[in-house]
């Protein structure tokens, strides 16, 4: 497997929790989520998605692939288009 290394802060915090994993396998996207942490406030996922977009934009800028603003604009544009007219219908269920 080709896993990412956890962030250093996660390794030093005994209360750290992983709440999402996204994999590409067999030419499809596969996701594992821990939703119980924000079970009564699903809107918090909107903050997480926004934070993730900003991290991606920072990474692209550091790699020299456009400015942070250009990358964020591209992410938001495609997100809104995909949200309005999905190109896929995620399936699956809860497992332990």
Spans of features found by a protein language model:
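Solvent-exposed interaction surfaces and binding hotspots enriched for charged
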Residues: 1-96
